[in-house]
Swiss-Prot record:
Residues passing through the membrane, by range: 461-481
The gene coding this protein: MTC6
Entry function: May be involved in telomere capping.
Organism: Kluyveromyces lactis (strain ATCC 8585 / CBS 2359 / DSM 70799 / NBRC 1267 / NRRL Y-1140 / WM37) (Yeast)
Keywords assigned: Glycoprotein, Membrane, Signal, Transmembrane, Transmembrane helix
InterPro entries: Telomere_Capping_Maintenance
Topology relative to the membrane: Single-pass type I membrane protein
A single cellular component GO annotation: membrane
Record topological domains on the Cytoplasmic side: 482-512
Keyword Iron (UniProt): no
Protein name: Maintenance of telomere capping protein 6
Amino acid sequence: MLLYFLVVAPLWMLSGLVRAEVWPSFSDEMIYAIRSQRDLMQNISIDQVPLPGLALKNSLPGSITSNETESLTTILSLLHHGIQSFRVDLTFNSSAGEWFLEGTNIRFVKMLNTVNLFVMATNTNLDANILTILLRFDNDTLRNSNAIKEANFTAILEEGLSPGYVYSIADLERDRELNQTLSINGYSDTGWVGLSRFLFDVKKRVVFGFLNGAELFSEDDQDNLVFPPETFHYVTANNITCPLNTVEDIMRVSQIQWRFLEGNFSYENYLHYLECGYSLILTNPIDTRNDSSQGTSLQRHLSSLLLWSWNATAPDDKLDESEDSDDSESSSTSQYVAYRCGAFSYNDYEDLDPFKIGNCYRNLPYLCRFSDRAYFWNISEDTGTYFESDDKDMCPTGYKFGVPRTPLQQRSLRIHLNDMDIDNLDFWIDINSISVSNCWITGGPYASCPYQKYGSRRNYIAMTVPTSAIALVLLLVIFYFNWVHVPIQDNRNNWKRIINAYSKEEVEGVPS
């Protein structure tokens, strides 16, 4: 096994990545948007984080004779293109004593090896994100329970994926004992750990769950790495009410942990269901072959599934000509231009990704959130530049400058704006890249980027000018002394004559 990870696996991954290059690559803007969404949710419990996903069975070549390397490369490409949840259908081959992905010749452990390679390659502050693997067993496997009880399922998981990356039931219990778990109302002994702690403190990446068949396994297998079916709220599109039309409906849904919605969706409806608080599991196959007609379709599906805040072409610190002209027509107290600030663009007639780039010096109202209540909003009566958002008087008493951090919060904001009879409005939200270009962060206009050290140009000039002046003076002094010589050499012969004359007058011997 060690030899596989040290030699065979890296070579396979390299060949797989070469083959994966036929997939359409993400733009820089798409990468910034995905990272921005992750960072917005750092203090959200992991059970409330939207996890774009699909049924793996529907996305792989549907033949038992399909090329294994090609299928594993497809899985790796899906991971690299932002898929965070997989419904994995498993079947147990009694004669081989092995678990396989249903309908394929791919061993489950090989699929886990692929996930492990991806996790190792992306285990950085910039790229790390949570993954969920939801396991479902076919009917033949469920009927063959006696043979399965002899198999050590936990050993299969540990063979395929490093246990250090897996968030276990014991990890959850420990975090609850340490008061490190959250609900929508703050710390809770029945909640889940926040995304930031999950990724960067306890350094986990993967959550396993059973969708059925947990009773097939021994107690050791049940109580170790895989959470039981009752942990997850897994439903189909026919069993929900959407859209949510009141804050009460939103609060009711938010009490449900790990919400997954399985269905055959069109990309135009992804945001509609995301704002109902569900992680989507697509059952309709996404054609991953990148011929001239499929590449654009795949990109459209992925961007619509992954993004609920920014458009796929934002953020990029630039605006197109139409947006630029819109800003020039708006009122502004300054001639300066800085497209580094986030605004929410609300239109009652379109449920589009609402975040956009705005000129920080433009005058707009501010979005205000009530204390620590996730779903209560207000729009300030006063307008101002983004840099004035630090003014405590901008928001009503009890409110502070805010931003929607989940699709559910975004839906609650739309409900508030609709109740206020607002048809069309742009307003500032608490997200910007002022400190470092394309590092989109919250915390007001003076927040610093966690990924890059920053010093303002003004402060840099203030620090370097005195040093430069002193260095210049010292340089001039050096040049002066090199140019104007002190006449020590010229007087040496004269001194020698004086000393010789004095020596002649001296009396040799001891004076009497």
